């Protein structure tokens, strides 16, 4: 039973940086930046919460272990409820999470966050932000600089192109996923 979610939330689409297991698979270890990363992220999320008078909800990465890493300063953390929170969100914040697709499909404002500690992750952030016509938000900027940023802008043309290029082949096809799978299987057999 999912609680009533209204657009009172700012949703952070978490990628479990710097603990994400994929880094270990490629021989990278970014745990040394954890304290600085989470300190800066919390300062920024508190800023954005105050600016818009909205609660920040962390939509945790499915493999996150925040029961081991108490890093979000008492912010609400939800697991496996990302779509529901994005659907009712005011804005979404991320680095380059694949769950950004939910925000695009649902036409939600997205801001792509960067800080110098995650230089190793700048390329994917740049790529997704650019494809959606968004500038990257450097959370190391001063409050006066951050105050100038429009966090609620949506570029409809870029969102539609992103959907066509990266999410679906045919936006006119209104069948659900399983109807498409069944039709493709029937063609083959």
What does each model-found stretch correspond to?
Residues 1, 65, 82-87, 141-148:
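A short acidic, often aromatic-flanked loop/helix-cap motif at beta-alpha or helix-coil junctions
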Residues 1-67:
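Conserved catalytic-core segment of nucleotide-activated headgroup transferases in glycan assembly
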Residues 2-8, 91-96, 148-155:
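Short, surface-exposed amphipathic charged segments that create phosphate/polyanion-binding patches used
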Residues 36-39, 154-157, 176:
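Alpha-helix boundary/N-cap detector
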Residues 40-52, 103, 132, 146-149, ...:
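Hydrophobic, Leu/Ile/Phe/Ala-enriched alpha-helical segments that form helix-helix packing faces
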Residues 54-106, 110, 116:
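Donor nucleotide-activated moiety binding/catalytic core segment of transferases
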Residues 69-74, 98-172:
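Catalytic binding pocket for nucleotide-activated donors in carbohydrate/polymer assembly enzymes
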Residues 167-189:
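C-terminal alpha-helical cap of glycosyltransferases
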């Amino acid at each position: 039973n999912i609680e009533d979610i209204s657009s009172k939330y700012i949703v952070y689409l978490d990628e479990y940086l710097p603990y994400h297991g994929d880094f270990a698979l490629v021989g990278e270890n970014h745990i040394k930046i954890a304290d600085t990363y989470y300190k800066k992220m919390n300062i920024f999320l508190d800023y954005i919460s105050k600016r818009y008078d909205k609660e920040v909800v962390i939509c945790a990465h499915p493999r996150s272990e925040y029961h081991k890493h108490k890093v979000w300063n008492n912010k609400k953390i939800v697991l496996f409820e990302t779509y529901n929170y994005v659907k009712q969100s005011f804005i979404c914040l991320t680095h380059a999470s694949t769950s950004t697709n939910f925000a695009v499909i649902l036409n939600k404002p997205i801001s792509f966050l960067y800080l110098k500690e995650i230089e190793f992750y700048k390329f994917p952030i740049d790529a997704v932000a650019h494809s959606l016509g968004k500038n990257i938000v450097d959370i190391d900027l001063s409050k006066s600089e951050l105050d100038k940023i429009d966090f609620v802008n949506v570029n409809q043309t870029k969102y539609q192109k992103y959907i066509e290029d990266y999410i679906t082949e045919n936006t006119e096809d209104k069948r659900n996923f399983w109807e498409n799978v069944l039709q493709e299987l029937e063609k083959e057999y």
